[in-house]
Amino acid sequence: MSFFRIAKTFEVEYGHRLSKHPEKCRFPHGHSLRIEVVARGRELNDQDMVCDYKALKMIVADVVDRLDHAMALNSSDPQLEGLAAIGDRVLLFDDCDPTTEVLARWIFEQVAERLAAGRIVKTTTGANYEIPAGLELERIRVWETSTSWGEYVGLE
């Protein structure tokens, strides 16, 4: 099966605590995440693209903004009450630690939902960008450090 593949990378500052970890990662700490979004399609649009990178960026922007300077926590974390005082920048994961793998799956689900929700995105200047009907989200790769990443693949 032949297809075209595109990728867009985003960077965001983010914190988490791995409540089940036996060593240092059980303490609140942060990362400069690099998020790679990979989409694919079988056909090119009338501009000879799978999808304009600007359209993909606009679809992912809300998800990246939700992560920006957020603290991700397990909803069952015994220290949740104290850490939740951070306020609206807390991102809770239902009964699981916010590992790189869990985060990649969450981002995938958020982006996939947004891709399905609307096929036209509009810029602040009024320009319209089409999300092609055949565009599929393939995977999300999250780099936690320059040498460590986890990914969630939604297509086989």
Regions found by a protein language model. Give the residues of each.
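Charge-rich, low-complexity N-terminal segments
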Residues: 1-156
